[in-house]
Every structure is written in C-alpha cells, then in structure tokens.
Amino acid sequence: MPLTPPPDFTKVYLSAALGVSLALVVWLLIRSTLPVVGDRDHNLPHGGWYRDGTKSVFYNSPGRLNSIEARKAPLLGQPWAIVVLLVLLIWASHKLGRPNCRACAGSHT
C-alpha cells in the first residue's frame, strides 16, 4: 500500500472564510439600528406624526448619537482628535527620546 499525502483543504477553508466574511459584511451593511416606532403599517424611524381614526402617534426624531454629531463639542472631546493626538505624542516621544538602545547602548536607526 503506497503512502499518499493527505488531501489539501486550504482552498475549502479559504472559500469558507471568504463566504463567512462576505455574509458578515453584507449583514452589517443592511441591518437597521434605528429605533422602531409604530406598528407594521405605520413606521416612523426618523420621527413624525401620524393620525387615523382611533390612533395617534407622535415621535420626535432621534437625538445625537455621540460627540461626533454634536454641534458644540470641544475639539479634544472628539474621538478622532484624541487618536491623532496620541499618535503624535507617541511619534514625538520616539523621535525626541533617547537615541541609544536601552539594551546595548548602541544607536539603531
């Protein structure tokens, strides 16, 4: 009985990972995170007013979600500004810090 190598399943795993990734991206793009207001016939996700014979619905529009959407938020309160500031501080401390290696006291550039 000759020895044969085991079958190569890399293409199967790659196809499965690609399919799961594509399904996850599509699900994230099409899902709705808006608050559900109304019933199955009268949906008011962005706010509004509806009235028929026995029913009346008034719903204000959703508020601001976070500091990015706020109009009067301070610049350093913005999440992107904090990230940029931290990146600049790390870069500056690397450039302006000790030029020598702490392990061997040599200069590695």
Swiss-Prot record:
| Localization per Swiss-Prot or TrEMBL | Host endoplasmic reticulum membrane
Could you identify this protein by its name?
Answer: Movement protein TGB2
InterPro entries per the record? Plant_vir_prot
Lumenal topological segments: 31-72
Q: What else is known?
A: TGBp1, TGBp2 and TGBp3 seem to act together for cell-to-cell propagation. TGBp1 is the main movement protein that physically cross the plasmodesma with the viral genome. TGBp2 and TGBp3 would facilitate TGBp1 function.
Task: Alphabetically list the UniProt keywords.
Answer: Host endoplasmic reticulum, Host membrane, Membrane, Transmembrane, Transmembrane helix, Transport, Viral movement protein
Report the GO terms under cellular component.
host cell endoplasmic reticulum membrane; membrane
Entry superkingdom:
Viruses
Q: Does the keyword Acetylation apply?
A: no
Q: Which GO terms describe its biological process?
A: transport of virus in host, cell to cell
**Species per Swiss-Prot/TrEMBL record:** Potato virus M (strain Russian) (PVM)
